[in-house]
Amino acid sequence: MKQKVVSIGDIKVANDLPFVLFGGMNVLESRDLAMRICEHYVTVTQKLGIPYVFKASFDKANRSSIHSYRGPGLEEGMKIFQELKQQFGVKVITDVHEISQCQPVAEVVDVIQLPAFLARQTDLVEAMARTGAVINVKKPQFVSPGQMGNIVEKFKEAGNDQVILCDRGSNFGYDNLVVDMLGINVMVKATGGHPVIFDVTHALQCRDPFGSASGGRRAQVAELARAGMAVGLAGLFIEAHPEPNSAKCDGPSALPLDKLEPFLMQMKAIDDLVKSFPELDTSK
């Protein structure tokens, strides 16, 4: 199958090209912390030769608790993103939750993300498509990999085929997620070769049934990411924090920032090896 290439400026995203890192922090906590984290990602990815897109949310609209931190909001968030782009020359990805956010966000960032909980909301899909921006679609935990073709078709019908898919795990009973590595290739086939990336951070979530925030399995981030990279991915999605236990959102799943370089060295080694193999058709 011919693999679709999605371009984020000069960055090419495809299942058979070297992987792209979509990384940063879960939510913008402050301007200074965003600058610090972005600078570290840029330094490490440039050293390792990994194409890089900075990720952060300006508003976490789907927090479990009404009391949880959501972010600085649209106006302040866009100012921070603009400064990061000017300071470090990075591409930026962030998520939108409402139709009214689509155009102003697309005027600043390079990729707009459709959250998993909203991935079947047709009006939001159409509004995102009309911006002409590159789209990253999070696979809902409750949707099978094969059904992702329907979501991509909505974007195409609305005039935008620059769509990347992102697996972040599937429901496994109550309050737990599991990643079906076979589903990655199912998504590729269901969408006619669209790029698929893997969000290892959110796949590590594991909830306390009565808690007000998500727990996580940070200690297993490397082994789960290695498994994903071994399948062959267009990209990897990872969030890091200098003090994960103090992070304002999803700290239990965040990679410690000082572990980013050795972590990415492993991911790049696996990606280079897997993509050096000739295609092997075992269907016949």
Swiss-Prot record:
InterPro entries: Aldolase_TIM, DAHP1/KDSA, KDO8P_synthase. The gene is kdsA. This is 2-dehydro-3-deoxyphosphooctonate aldolase. Its main location: cytoplasm. Belongs to the KdsA family. Transmembrane segments: none annotated. GO terms for molecular function: 3-deoxy-8-phosphooctulonate synthase activity. Gene3D superfamilies: Aldolase class I. SUPFAM superfamilies: Aldolase (SSF51569). The keyword Transport does not apply. It is found in: Cytoplasm. One of its GO terms (biological process) is keto-3-deoxy-D-manno-octulosonic acid biosynthetic process.
